[in-house]
Swiss-Prot record:
PANTHER family: HYALURONAN SYNTHASE, MANNURONAN SYNTHASE. Belongs to the NodC/HAS family. This is N-acetylglucosaminyltransferase. Its EC number is 2.4.1.-. It is an enzyme of class 2 (transferase). GO terms for cellular component: plasma membrane. It comes from Neorhizobium galegae. It is found in: Cell membrane. InterPro entries: Chitooligosach_Synthase_NodC (IPR026463), Glyco_trans_2-like (IPR001173), Nucleotide-diphossugar_trans (IPR029044).
Amino acid sequence: MTLLETIGIAAVTLHALLSAIYKSMQAFYARKASGSQPRSKDIDPAALPSVDIIVPCFNEDPAILSACLSSLAGQDYGGKLRIYMVDDGSCNREAILPVHDFYTSDPRFEFLLLSKNVGKRKAQIAAIERSCGDLILNVDSDTSIASDVVTLLVEKMRDSDVGAAMGQLKASNRDKNLLTRLIDMEYWLACNDERAAQARFGAVMCCCGPCAMYRRSALLLLLDQYQTQLYRGKPSDFGEDRHLTILMLSAGFRTEYVPEAIAKTVVPDRMGSYLRQQLRWARSTFRDTLLALPLLPSHNRFLTLDAIHQNIGPLLLAVSSATGITQFILTATVPGWTIIIIASMTMVRCSVAAYRSRQIRFLAFSLHTLINLFMLIPLKGFALLTLSNSDWLSRGSTTDGPAIAESNAASNEAEIVASASPFGGGTSWRFRR
């Protein structure tokens, strides 16, 4: 046995052992907890917290934006609800203004039109400073939420120790092609395996941007840190959802996952868009993992194992894959042990997912292993080597995935040039920050 074979076998075996331990514990903790909270419908509406929904938007497709706003208007929530749609200097503003106009007669809606593109994070903050609700729900402009999402998330936020809660994400364009079907299954696993297990300890590590609720009092404490995130002295403009979640945990708040709160978001339908999205996410994950490390000792040991698996696992898989390919090129011999282990792990994972979800389609998720091995793992390596790069790598297409249409164009000042809120009698107003 050559040194190359030994390294490959050792790496893939260690990866298999790590994954077996981690996935077993994850499946155990991801089980649905018993017990239920009182439904908000059974509570006096006057006692319910007020909720502000914030929707940042940049160059969104009018039909997709209309579906988003329609789902917000249809929320079955007994408490006070306000909806702030922030247009972040869209180039297609003329095309989306008719969508705004359709809701101007609804007193719950207010439209903030930024004169220039400032990026998703600053667009959110513009609305946060304008709003006053007890709870803030962030919804991406390419996302539609079920009618009970606000109610379900508010129920989880009734615990004052909870600083943030997210719903379950699904792909609204799942049936478009094979890639969107795989991404939809990837989302299911990310939510109902990873987030569900983390939520058992009140420490969801990323409350995903398309549908996440925050406690205003907690958010205001963290707003300066959120707004001025730096990495190696440079502004960090993406991964805002993960960063804000880590800030919540650092401040001592719990972060939760509510699987019944369903949000459907547009996912990439082209491989190039998907890889650009994954590159941004990989960079933000690596950056905020460093920020999260000091938190791990104060939480259950499973979360430390989770961090190890998320970061060391891909490294072991990369080593085993690279040595296997090199072995085949140099010696024309097939790395049989590596192939058997990876194939076995894939089938076990997909079979467990099919059983837990009661959906046989998850057996087809084995195809995603090829994408992971030959595209995502090298991409993560590139992300690690280019952590200082904060480019969004987006052309503004709405098919680039959740929230990726927003640009990271830098600007320290934003001007709100108009409001479609009927409270102002249709009069334009301005303010600067």
